[in-house]
Curated annotation (Swiss-Prot):
GO biological process terms held by the UniProt record: tRNA N2-guanine methylation
Molecular function GO labels: tRNA (guanine(26)-N2)-dimethyltransferase activity; tRNA binding
Protein task: Dimethylates a single guanine residue at position 26 of a number of tRNAs using S-adenosyl-L-methionine as donor of the methyl groups.
InterPro entries: SAM-dependent_MTases_sf, Trm1, TRM1_arc_bac, tRNA_met_Trm1_C
Quaternary context: Monomer.
Trm1 methyltransferase domain: residues covered: 6-378
Keywords: Methyltransferase, RNA-binding, S-adenosyl-L-methionine, Transferase, tRNA processing, tRNA-binding
Protein name per the record: tRNA (guanine(26)-N(2))-dimethyltransferase
Annotated binding of S-adenosyl-L-methionine, by residue: R38, R63, D80, D122, A123
Organism: Pyrococcus furiosus (strain ATCC 43587 / DSM 3638 / JCM 8422 / Vc1)
Enzyme nomenclature, EC number: 2.1.1.216
Family named by the database record: Belongs to the class I-like SAM-binding methyltransferase superfamily. Trm1 family.
Length: 381
């Protein structure tokens, strides 16, 4: 390898990373800003304890190495189509584990307390080869995960767990609606609700793809952070489970003039200006998120403690219903000076409604109060 390398520490792992002007110029991609993303999945794997796991698009191998060092996983697969990445992954595994690699063709295996398999191939080809093999697969591509989703759903066990990241915010947030229609088979919504609608479009398309294989699913956690969308789902075996899951699909109707929205669970939209289809079911399993938070607070070591604590705390407390009111956007539309979020939440609760902040927007409130009530509370002096 002719790359100039430097050492990076993240969590319990240390990895060699190529020197480059920007992360996008690097011959092998490593993004330090995605460390919290990796922290969250490490916490999840400690709660759910899958044994055989795959990081399908590994680059430097940081995610897979952290799985090996920081989770109970027993067999960890790391894969990248890039030969330089493959060579770097081998170096990085040996930087963290004492021993030797047994290499055969484009696969190197480390046997120790854990089995680590380093693979140099197209992710789709590897996942097609390992049919119903993995307890957990993580798809964290550069851009859209859609070209890998089908194969991942066939490679993971029928009751396995799938992690999916999408970093193509422009299509999912409605800036490129045609690209969203092509890739995610859904119409996105531009504006203040775009991050939640984008998250729900991603979860919705996973549900539709899974249903083809007579699989249902439960959302363990889905969120938006730092320009990426993230979803973890647990698959459920059987056509009936698939049918039940599809009942959570539907559409959002949004009035641009007033900021009023409605949601409808339906396979087809019943009126114009529908955004979707998208997921209208829960975006979290309360128990799983609670256990992740508990683990973190108990002193579990992650790379970005404060950031992840803030995120998980917000996700845990957040009201799990579709969409929210953005106080600034509503204030602009209705020509009202927006009040403090805390005041609005307090007022709504005193009226018997549920209300919380949302991680999707620093100026947003999730509530089961009707639009008219929310506006009335905003107008109050």
């Amino acid at each position: 390898m002719s790359m100039e390398l430097f050492e990076v520490h993240e969590g319990k792992a240390k990895v060699l990373v190529p020197k480059a002007k920007t992360i996008y110029d690097s011959p092998v991609f490593y993004n330090p800003r995605m460390a919290p993303n990796r922290d969250v999945v490490v916490l999840l794997l400690n709660v759910l304890k899958p044994k055989i796991v795959l990081d399908a698009l590994s680059a430097t191998g940081i995610r897979g190495i952290r799985f090996a060092l920081e989770t109970p996983a027993e067999e960890i697969w790391m894969n990248d189509i890039n030969e330089l990445a493959y060579e770097l992954m081998k170096k990085n595994v040996l930087l963290n584990f004492k021993g030797t690699l047994k290499e055969n063709a484009k696969r190197a295996i480390f046997e120790g307390e854990k089995t680590i398999v380093i693979n140099n191939d197209d992710a789709n080809r590897l996942m097609a080869e390992k049919h119903r093999y993995f307890h957990f697969i993580d798809l964290d591509p550069f851009g859209s995960p859609m070209e890998f989703l089908d194969t991942a759903l066939r490679s993971v066990k029928r009751k396995g767990i799938l992690g999916v990241t999408a970093t193509d915010g422009a299509p999912l947030c409605g800036a490129h609606p045609k690209a969203c229609l092509r890739k995610y088979l859904a119409v996105p919504l531009r504006g203040e609700l775009c991050h939640e609608v984008g998250t729900r479009i991603l979860v919705g398309v996973i549900a539709r793809y899974a249903a083809k294989y007579d699989l249902g699913m439960e959302v363990l956690l889905a969120y938006y952070k730092d320009h990426y969308f993230r979803a973890f789902v647990k698959l459920k075996d059987g056509a009936k489970k698939g049918d039940e899951t599809l009942e959570n699909l539907g559409y959002v109707y949004f009035d641009e003039k007033t900021g009023r929205f409605e949601v409808e669970k339906s396979f087809l939209s019943t009126r114009p200006n529908a955004y979707g289809p998208l997921w209208l079911g829960p975006l979290k399993n309360e128990k799983v998120v609670g256990e992740m938070l508990e683990l973190l607070v108990s002193g579990f070591e992650v790379a970005n403690y404060r950031e992840v604590l803030k995120l998980l705390h917000m996700l845990h407390e957040e009201l799990d219903i579709p969409l929210f009111y953005d106080t600034h956007a509503l204030g602009k539309r209705l020509k009202i000076e927006p009040k403090k979020l805390g005041e609005i939440i307090k007022e709504l609760k005193s009226m018997g409604y549920e209300a919380t902040r949302t991680h999707f927007s620093p100026t947003g409130i999730k509530t089961n109060a009707p639009y008219e009530v929310f506006v009335e509370v905003m107008r109050k002096n």
